[in-house]
């Protein structure tokens, strides 16, 4: 029972971390695109 709970908590934390990382990566790409647009104009 305890092993199952630990695995569940680790899995949940991994999924949540992955979502935050993907969102941060998307924002970085957006900022990069804005910088390129400003440099081009």
From Swiss-Prot:
Bilayer topology term: Lipid-anchor
Query: What InterPro entries does UniProt report for this protein, alphabetically?
Result: Entericidin
Q: Which cellular component appears as one GO term in the record?
A: plasma membrane
Positions with an attached lipid (N-palmitoyl cysteine) read: 19
UniProt signal peptide: 1-18
Q: Which GO terms describe its biological process?
A: response to toxic substance
Describe the family membership recorded for this protein in Swiss-Prot or TrEMBL: Belongs to the EcnA/EcnB lipoprotein family.
Its recorded name reads Entericidin A
Instruction: State the encoding gene.
Output: ecnA
């Amino acid at each position: 029972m305890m092993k199952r709970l630990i695995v569940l908590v680790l899995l949940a934390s991994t999924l949540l971390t992955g979502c935050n990382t993907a969102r941060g990566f998307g924002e970085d790409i957006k900022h990069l695109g804005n910088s390129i647009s400003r440099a081009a104009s």
